[in-house]
Regions:
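RNA pseudouridine synthases
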Residues: 1-192, 196-203, 300-305
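Short alpha-helix capping/helix-loop boundary micro-motifs
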Residues: 59-64, 228-231, 266
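Short secondary-structure boundary/hinge segments and terminal tails
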Residues: 67-68, 266, 291
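Edge beta-strands of extracellular beta-sandwich domains
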Residues: 88-90, 255-259
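Conserved hydrophobic positions within beta-strands
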Residues: 93, 182, 219-222, 255
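The conserved catalytic core of RNA pseudouridine synthases
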Residues: 135-166, 175, 194-195, 199-251, ...
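Short, surface-exposed loop/helix-turn segments at secondary-structure junctions
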Residues: 257-269
Length: 308
C-alpha cells in the first residue's frame, strides 16, 4: 500500500515552524523564564541564545538577560541558531525572520543610494549582513526614510515578500507614526494637512490645489507645548518624499533643524532634524500575524520641553 503523501506546508506554516513560542504567565526576568522552559540548558547556553539574537519578546529581539517579563507577553526562540552576530553604530536590527527585517536607523544614514549618492546606506549594511549566511542572500527595499530622519523601517528578504508589501502596503500597515519637534506653539490640538506635492529634485513643492502633483495627507496631534516648541505625533495617510517636513512648513511650524523647509537660520539646540519614525504596526506579509514595533521618543527631543 502506497504511503499517503503529507500535504505541503504553506509559507505561513513554514514561517511559524521556525519558532518555539511561550506565553508568560507570571512576572519574572527573561533568564529565569528561559531556564524554566529549557531546564537542560546551561546558563552559558542561554546567554549564547541571547547574544545570537534569536530570542524575541513580543516580536522584538531581546538580548538583555534581566529583561522584566509581564503576564501576557510572548517569548519566542528562533530555531535558526546559525544567525550571525550584528553590531553597527548606524542601525540596529529589532526583528528578523525568513521574510522580513525590521530595523531602527540613526539620523544621517541614507536608506538607499540614489544615482547621485554613492555611499554606505542601510540597504548596503543589511546586504553585507545577510550575505554572511549565503552569497545569494540579499534584502529588498520596501519603503524609505529620509537621510536625516531616524526610526523604524522594514526591508524584505525575498522578491515575493517585497512585492506583497509594496502592492498591499495600505492594507498591511495599520499604524505608521512619527514624532517631531516643531518651532513655535501649535495652535490646534489636532488636525489634518492636505496638499499636492511635486518633487523638484532639490526640494519638494506644495500646492493647496491640484496642480498635477501627488495628493498628500498628514494627520497631526499636539502632545506638548513649552519653551517655544511643540511636540507632535504625525500619522501619514500617504507616504511622499519629505511629506511631513513640507506639511509642517505649510502650517507655519517647521521642524527643528530643517534647513530646507522653513528652518534655515533658526537655532538648532539638538544638532539634528527633530523627526523620528517611532511606530510601525503591520500584518506580517506571510503569516498574517499582527506585528507591532515602537521606540521611545528620542531623549534630546524631550529635553527641549524641560522647565527652564
Amino acid at each position: 500500500m502506497a504511503k499517503e503523501k503529507r500535504p505541503k506546508r504553506t509559507p505561513a506554516e513554514k514561517a511559524r515552524a521556525q519558532y518555539t513560542g511561550y506565553l508568560v504567565k507570571e512576572p519574572m526576568d527573561l533568564m529565569g523564564f528561559l531556564a524554566a522552559k529549557m531546564p537542560d540548558a546551561s546558563r552559558t547556553k542561554l546567554k549564547s541564545l541571547l547574544s545570537k539574537r534569536v530570542v524575541y519578546v513580543d516580536n522584538v529581539i531581546t538580548t538583555q538577560f534581566d529583561f522584566a517579563l509581564k503576564p501576557g507577553m510572548k517569548v519566542q526562540i528562533s530555531k535558526d541558531k546559525g544567525r550571525k552576530e550584528f553590531n553597527n553604530r548606524l542601525l540596529k536590527i529589532v526583528y528578523e525572520d525568513a521574510f522580513i527585517i525590521v530595523i531602527e536607523k540613526k539620523e544621517g544614514l541614507l536608506s538607499v543610494n540614489t544615482e547621485r549618492q554613492k555611499e554606505r546606506t542601510a540597504y548596503t549594511i543589511l546586504n553585507e549582513y545577510v550575505q554572511r549566511s549565503g552569497k545569494h542572500h540579499r534584502v529588498y527595499v520596501v519603503h524609505r526614510l529620509d537621510r536625516d530622519t531616524s526610526g523604524i523601517m522594514m526591508f524584505a528578504k525575498d522578491e515575493k515578500t517585497q512585492h506583497t508589501l509594496r502592492e498591499y502596503w495600505h492594507d498591511i500597515v495599520t499604524d505608521r507614526r512619527y514624532v517631531a519637534v516643531v518651532e513655535g506653539e501649535m495652535e490646534k490640538d489636532h488636525g489634518t494637512v492636505t496638499s499636492w506635492l511635486t518633487d523638484r529634485i532639490l526640494y519638494v513643492s506644495s500646492s493647496q490645489y491640484d496642480d498635477g502633483g501627488s495628493k498628500s495627507i498628514t494627520h497631526y496631534h499636539t502632545i506638548k507645548r513649552a519653551n517655544g516648541y511643540s511636540l507632535m505625533e504625525l500619522d501619514l495617510e500617504t507616504g511622499r518624499k519629505n511629506q511631513i517636513r513640507v506639511h509642517m512648513q505649510d502650517l507655519g511650524h517647521p521642524i527643528i533643524g530643517d534647513g530646507r523647509y522653513g528652518g534655515e537660520g533658526v537655532p538648532n539646540p539638538i544638532g539634528r532634524l527633530a523627526l523620528h519614525a517611532f511606530k510601525l504596526c503591520f500584518y506580517h506579509p506571510v503569516t498574517n500575524e499582527l506585528m507591532e514595533f515602537e521606540t521611545p521618543y528620542p531623549p534630546n527631543f524631550k529635553k527641549l520641553f524641560l522647565k527652564q
